C-alpha cells in the first residue's frame, strides 16, 4: 500500500473526526445490554491496514517476563509479546487469545456473571458502554512503568468475523487463580462477535483475536473523554486510536501513519442535519451537514444508506450494498482479502473488477504477504514477499 495514499486517507479521517463529529455522549443513555454504543463509534478508520497488522502480530516473538498465561481453566496458553514495545511512537504490547466477557464494574450483575466485582481497576466502568480489555494482574505489576490504566487498545476480531478492528481502553485486570488472558467487556465482545450471543458465562472460544495495548502516558485516554463509569467522547478514542495504530503501521513498514496534521477535537454538540430528507443516525456523516454534505473518502464514511459522491456524503438510491463495513468500494486495501463481497484490491483501493479470479484460501490470495509458495492459494506464487499470479 503506498505510504502517501495511506497517510492522506488517514489524515482525512482524522480531520473528519476532529471537525465534523466532535460528539459528546451521555454514557448512561447507552448503559444497556442491548443498547450500547454502535460499532461505528469505536471502529478503526477504513484507511488502517488491519490485515497487515494482524499478520505482523502473529509473527511477534519477543517474550518479556511474566508474559504467558492460559486462556482458560486447563486450556492452551497465550503469550504477550513486546516486539513493538520499544518504538518511540505507537509502542505497544500484543497478544493473540480468545475473548471471554468481563462485566466487572457498573454492570457486574450482567447475564452469566453471578460473581462479578463492583469495581474495575481505575473506576467502575460500564461493560455495556465502554469497550475495554483486560490484562493479567501479574503482567500489569511487572510493567507498571509503561502499561497505564485507561490506555488506548486496539482489538482485531477473528477473520471469521471479518477481521474488523475496534478501539477500546485497558480498563481492568484479571486476578483470578490462575490468571488468564483473552478477556474484554460485554460491549467489545458482543460487537466483535454479534452472532454468538456472548455473555458473562459464554465467551468466544477460538484463540483468534488480536489484542494490542499501547504504552506510555501519551496513550492514556484523557479525563475529558472518560469518567469513572463511561466514555464521554468516542471521537477522542477513535482519533487517538487511528493516530497510535498509524504510527505502529509506519514503524512496521506497513504503509504510513506518520506526518499527520494535529487533530483539533471539540466537545460541543453537533447541529442537526439540514437540507436533506429523512433521519441520519451518525452525526457528522450526513448528507446535509452544514448544508454541504459531510466530507468522505468512501461510502463507509457516510451514515445509513448515503453514498460518498465527489468527496461528499449524498443520497444515492442506487448505492451498492456492502456487507463488510470499512472494506467497501473506495476503502484502502493491500490484497483482495481486505475488500468486501466481490470487490477486488486494485492499486490499493477496493474496486469493482468483473474479471477478478476467485480465491479459495482466505488470507492467502493475490497480494497477501508470504514467505514461500506454500503460503499462497492455488496457482499463485510467492514473489518478493507477496502472493502473485
Curated annotation (Swiss-Prot):
Residues 1-22 form the signal peptide. Pfam families: Glyco_hydro_75. This is Endo-chitosanase C. The C-terminal R3 domain contains 3 tandem repeats required for the binding to insoluble chitosan. PANTHER family: ENDO-CHITOSANASE. Keywords: Carbohydrate metabolism, Glycosidase, Hydrolase, Polysaccharide degradation, Repeat, Secreted, Signal. One of its GO terms (molecular function) is chitosanase activity. Belongs to the glycosyl hydrolase 75 family. It is found in: Secreted. One of its GO terms (biological process) is polysaccharide catabolic process. Chitosanase catalyzing the endo-type cleavage of chitosan, the deacylated form of chitin. Chitosanase may be crucial in the degradation of the deacetylated portion of chitin in the fungal cell wall. Chitoolisaccharides produced by the hydrolysis of partially N-acetylated chitosan are known to have many biological activities, including antibacterial activity, immune-enhancing effects, and elicitor activity.
Amino acid at each position: 500500500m503506498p505510504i502517501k495514499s495511506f497517510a492522506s486517507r488517514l489524515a482525512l479521517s482524522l480531520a473528519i473526526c476532529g471537525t465534523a463529529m466532535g460528539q459528546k455522549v451521555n454514557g448512561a443513555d447507552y448503559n444497556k445490554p442491548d443498547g450500547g454504543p454502535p460499532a461505528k463509534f469505536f471502529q478503526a478508520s477504513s484507511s488502517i491496514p488491519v490485515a497487515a497488522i494482524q499478520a505482523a502480530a502473529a509473527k511477534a516473538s519477543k517474550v518479556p517476563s511474566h508474559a504467558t498465561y492460559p486462556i482458560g481453566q486447563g486450556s492452551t496458553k497465550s503469550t504477550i509479546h513486546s516486539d513493538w514495545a520499544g518504538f518511540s511512537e505507537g509502542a505497544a504490547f500484543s497478544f493473540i487469545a480468545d475473548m471471554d466477557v468481563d462485566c466487572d464494574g457498573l454492570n457486574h450483575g450482567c447475564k452469566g456473571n453471578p460473581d462479578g466485582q463492583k469495581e474495575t481497576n481505575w473506576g467502575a466502568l460500564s461493560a455495556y458502554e465502554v469497550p475495554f480489555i483486560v490484562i493479567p494482574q501479574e503482567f500489569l505489576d511487572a510493567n507498571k512503568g509503561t502499561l497505564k490504566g485507561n490506555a488506548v487498545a486496539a482489538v482485531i476480531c477473528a477473520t471469521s468475523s471479518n477481521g474488523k478492528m475496534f478501539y477500546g481502553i485497558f480498563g481492568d485486570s484479571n486476578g483470578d487463580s490462575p490468571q488468564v488472558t483473552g478477556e474484554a467487556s460485554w460491549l467489545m465482545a458482543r460487537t466483535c462477535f454479534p452472532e454468538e450471543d456472548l455473555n458473562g458465562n459464554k465467551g468466544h472460544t477460538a484463540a483468534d483475536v488480536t489484542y494490542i495495548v499501547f504504552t506510555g502516558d501519551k496513550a492514556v485516554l484523557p479525563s475529558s473523554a472518560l469518567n469513572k463509569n463511561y466514555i464521554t467522547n468516542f471521537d477522542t478514542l477513535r482519533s487517538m486510536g487511528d493516530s497510535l495504530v498509524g504510527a505502529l503501521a509506519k514503524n512496521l513498514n506497513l504503509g504510513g501513519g506518520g506526518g499527520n496534521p494535529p487533530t483539533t477535537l471539540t466537545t460541543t454538540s453537533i447541529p442537526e442535519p439540514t437540507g436533506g430528507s429523512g433521519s441520519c443516525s451518525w452525526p457528522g456523516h450526513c448528507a446535509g451537514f452544514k448544508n454541504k454534505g459531510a466530507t468522505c473518502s468512501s461510502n463507509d464514511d457516510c451514515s445509513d444508506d448515503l453514498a460518498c459522491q465527489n468527496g461528499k456524503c449524498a443520497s444515492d438510491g442506487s448505492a451498492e450494498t456492502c456487507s463488510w463495513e470499512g472494506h467497501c468500494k473506495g476503502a484502502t486495501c493491500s490484497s483482495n482479502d481486505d475488500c468486501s463481497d466481490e470487490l477486488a484490491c486494485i492499486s490499493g483501493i477496493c474496486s469493482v473488477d468483473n474479471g477478478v479470479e476467485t480465491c479459495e484460501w482466505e488470507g492467502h490470495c493475490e497480494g497477501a504477504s508470504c514467505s514461500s509458495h506454500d503460503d499462497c492459494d492455488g496457482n499463485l506464487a510467492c514473489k518478493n514477499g507477496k502472493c502473485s499470479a
